[in-house]
A protein has these predicted regions:
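Short glycine/threonine-rich loop-to-helix capping motif typified by GTGT followed
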Residues: 192, 346-361, 390-396
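Conserved PLP-enzyme active-site core in the AAT-like
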Residues: 2-34, 40, 44-55, 61, ...
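Phosphate/diphosphate-binding loops
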Residues: 256-257, 359-369, 373-374
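PLP-dependent enzyme catalytic core of the Aspartate aminotransferase-like
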Residues: 309, 385-421
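Short, solvent-exposed beta-strand edge segments and adjacent coil->beta transition regions
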Residues: 262-264, 342, 400-404
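Flexible glycine/proline-rich, aromatic-decorated loop/lid segments
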Residues: 137-140, 269, 274-277, 297, ...
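Conserved glycine-rich beta-strand-loop-beta hairpin in the small C-terminal domain of fold type I
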Residues: 322-323, 337-349
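Short, conserved charged micro-motifs
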Residues: 276, 354-362, 410-419
């Protein structure tokens, strides 16, 4: 007999949350200048601002934190984390940082210079920010299918090989590396196929360019490859991860996502020159090379979290909750980026608020209205986040305008999903 689906964990600790009145929320959002980031946590009922660092850790992770080695140099906790990263990725050199954007800052400080171009798939805002703050340019080569939110294709996060090849044929001398974000957050938490990773690798090789992965949600990407890509259905998540990273020369990682911790990140690579140059900036910005802004206890938790969250059952539980919320939204005919992504539901705000012109930022408007109605805090991923063009200073309206509902791992139940829907 096949049992019905149920979560692959049980709950050991809970935290109370409280509802508020609409009158209270109207006062609070006004005091926050209609910026949900300015709200206090206790003013939020269900917090879907991000899945970064907001997850519930496992008992093994908490146990690991109790025996963290806090030595300034050569901490055993660092070597535990490094060994796990080596096993999952094949990357030899590991440089810890306090979170993902710090990893970008350290690595880009030695790789990106004024006038450079960094092609990739829908660079996230911090990635784009670190590129543009150095007077370089982020070039989006995402497949066009990602712009059509109602189109059901399995890998809407892919890099368009033709776009990438054409751009490199014209600007290769100005490109320090190609970046691939797995999963593609800005496009709706959409995965990148293994076939596409191979294509990117081959095109990069053609122009003698290294490939960097923004790997915050690499385990969720591996899950989608196992579920959706022919030939991988019998592979383990760890086997899929190892193959994914074989097509890259390095990675930046926010461990606050798929390592299921509250704080942490790292750079990993097989290019010794990258490591040697990044070490200098790492020491200046983050700390010594065996802690990089992280406590030993946090490095223990990262090592354990990477191991646990590259198991199928853990990922299946997580992604089925996202899919449950998507099914509930379907009942109410709410348009979102289809199919549902790995870490969030991305509501297509202009299709919901058809009367709000793009100049008045539909996704930001919908974000505020959702908070006022139910005390739920989402996040705009769209025209505001895209910022103005650094050269023309005009708003960038070319992409999607989403209200992102990011679901923290192992935090909320499906009853909460019902409230959200």
């Amino acid at each position: 007999m096949e049992l019905p689906f149920a979560e692959s964990w049980k709950i050991k600790m809970v935290e109370p949350i409280r509802k508020s009145t609409r009158k209270e929320r109207e006062k609070w959002i006004k005091e926050a200048h209609y910026n949900v980031f300015q709200l206090k946590a206790e003013q939020v009922y269900i917090d879907l601002l991000t899945d970064s660092g907001t997850n519930a850790m496992s008992d093994r992770q908490w146990a690991g934190m109790m025996i963290g080695d806090e030595s300034y140099a050569g901490a055993t906790s660092f070597f535990k984390m490094k060994e796990m990263i080596n096993r999952l990725t094949g990357f030899e050199y590991v440089l810890p940082t306090h979170q993902g954007r710090a990893a970008e800052n350290v690595l880009f400080s030695c790789l990106v210079k004024e006038g450079d171009y960094i092609p990739g798939n829908s660079h996230f805002d911090t990635t784009k920010g670190h590129i543009e703050s150095r007077k370089a340019f982020a070039v989006d080569c995402t497949v066009d299918e990602a712009k059509n939110t109602q189109l059901e294709v399995p890998f809407k996060g892919n890099v368009d090989p033709d776009k990438l090849d054409k751009f490199l044929s014209e600007k290769a001398d100005k490109v320090p590396f190609v970046i691939v974000t797995i999963t593609n957050n800005t496009a709706g938490g959409q995965p990148v196929s293994m076939k596409n990773l191979r294509q990117v690798r081959n095109i990069a090789n053609k122009y003698h360019k290294p490939v960097l992965f923004d790997s915050a949600r690499f385990a969720e990407n591996a899950y989608f490859i196992k579920i959706r890509e022919k030939g991988y259905e019998n592979k383990t998540i760890k086997e899929i991860c190892r193959e994914m990273f074989s097509y890259a020369d390095g990675m930046t990682m926010s461990a606050k996502k798929d390592a299921v911790v509250n704080m942490g990140g790292f750079i990993a690579t097989n290019i010794q020159d990258w490591y040697d140059r990044a070490k200098v900036f790492g020491i200046v910005y983050e700390g010594y090379i065996t802690y990089g802004g992280m406590n030993g206890r946090d490095m223990n938790a990262v090592a354990i979290g990477l191991d646990e969250n590259t198991e199928f059952d853990n990922l299946e539980t997580r992604i089925k909750q996202i899919q449950y919320l998507a099914q509930r939204l379907d009942e109410f005919n709410i348009p979102y980026q289809r199919p549902a992504g790995g870490h969030a539901i991305f509501i297509d705000a202009p299709k919901v608020l058809t009367h709000v012109p793009k100049e008045e930022f539909p996704a930001q408007t919908l974000t505020i209205e959702l908070y006022l109605e139910a005390g739920i805090r989402g996040c705009e991923i769209g025209y505001l986040l895209a910022d103005r063009d650094p050269v023309t200073r005009q708003n960038r309206f070319g992409g999607n305008d989403f209200l992102r509902l990011a679901i923290p791992r192992r935090v909320y139940t499906n009853n909460h999903m019902d409230v959200i829907a």
